[in-house]
C-alpha cells in the first residue's frame, strides 16, 4: 500500500495492490506510479524499502513519471564486496567512450562484451569486461583482484545511464540528509500494523484475488474516512495506531473490534 507522508495533515492511503505471495515487490512499482499519475496523485518522491528498488525501475520512474524513488539499492554481489576486502567492482575505472575497464593496478581489460539481456524483468542489462589469466597471474596483488585459480576475472556492470544512476544513488545513501529523509518511510509500518491487527487484513474473507483486492480497497477507504474525520486537514495528527477505533472508551467487557466488517 502507498500513503502520503507530508506531515502537515492526516496520512491518506492513495494506492493498494493485491499480489500473490510468490510475487516480488519490485514487480508492482511501475504500476503504482502509473495509477498515481492517472489519478493526479503523482508524488515528487516515493520512499520505499529495499524490496522495491532496482536500477531499471528507478530509471523508469524518473524518465516516465518524474518520480524520484528513495530507497536502498541492493549491494554489489561480488565476493570482494561481500568480504569487505580486495578490489570490488567500483574500484575498477570504467571508460564507456573507449569501452575500456582498467583495474586498480593499471591493467586494461582485454574484452568488452554486451550489454546482455538478463532473464529477470527487474535486472539491468549487463556489460562484461574480461581480464585474462596472462594479466592476472603475474599480478603481485592477485589475491585482492580475483578468486579464480588461473588469475582471470570478469567485471560486470550495467550500461552508462544505469551505472551513473547506481553510483549516484549509493553516494546519496552515505549522506546524513538521505537517512533523515528516508526515516519518514518507517511510518508505513504503523499503517501495515493497523491493517493487519486492527482490520484483520492477514486473512482474506473471500476466495479469489479480485474479491481479496476489493476487501483491501474498501478497508483502505474506511481507514481514510476514519483518519480524515478524526484529523481534518490542517490539524496535527497523532501517530498511527493499530486500533480499529482509537480514542473511544472501551470497557473491559467490550473487546476491541477485529475489523471494519465487524462494525457494519
Which residues make up each language-model segment?
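Anion-binding and metal-coordination hotspots
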Residues: 1-264
